[in-house]
Amino acid sequence: MLGAENIINKEKYPLDQPKTDVWKTLAENCKSAFQQSGVAILKNFVQQPILDRMITETDSTIHRSHFCKDNHNVFFEEDDNTLPADHPLRMREDTSLNSIPHDLMNSQDALHLLYNWDPLIRFLSEVLGYKLFRMADPMAALTVNCMGAGQNHGWHYDESQVTITLLIQRPDDGGLFQTIPDLRKKDTDDYSQLGSVLKGSDVGVVTLNVEPGDLLLFAGFYSLHRVTPIKGD
């Protein structure tokens, strides 16, 4: 039986040893990176043999996934026809993906075990500076977003302050995670640059180097981001 402690790269990430200097240094480095840029990437967090298992388990469930096809603005809000037609809040983005909800996952699936591993949530709480709790929603607590040929996630902001994502498989091409860091401020939105990006400008766009097995901590509430169209199955 697979134990959660055997899922991650423990030589590099001894998350179950919080009293060690290695753990404390790792947490501090991740915290510093996240505070500076809104991004922290734990490279090679899960190694290939476990990724292969995660892919197999996901493939066995994808036929039951929820298909999502949406035309939305960056905030996922209803259209406001009191605004000019070319206002960024009225500009639409297309998103197409399949999502596997938490309640369809087997309790012994590697992703499920990792999500419920206490040392992981303790470490992430230390990095983010506040206590994290697992979501009680039986469907949305943990989801797997799957994209095939032509699917993508259009420009948007997240509803949550922070998103934690593990990439388990690379597409043949495309599928780039792109962002404009801190485009949105606590009290203001830069509609001028937002409008330019939605019209096709790549000024300020950063492509994150996220590989299969990497764990990404991302402040998606303030940073505009997207996943470019996928090529391959």
Predicted regions and their residues:
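A short, aromatic/hydrophobic, helix- or strand-capping loop or linear motif
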Residues: S65-V74, A136-M139
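Short beta-strand His + acidic residue motifs that chelate non-heme Fe in jelly-roll/DSBH
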Residues: H153, L224-K231
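Non-heme Fe(II)/2-oxoglutarate
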Residues: I8, Q178, D182, P229-D233
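Signature of the catalytic double-stranded beta-helix
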Residues: V46-Q47, R53-H63, P84-P138
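Catalytic core of non-heme Fe(II) oxygenases with the double-stranded beta-helix
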Residues: N106-H112, I121-L215
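Short amphipathic
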Residues: A40-V46, N209
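Fe(II)/2-oxoglutarate
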Residues: M1-Q36
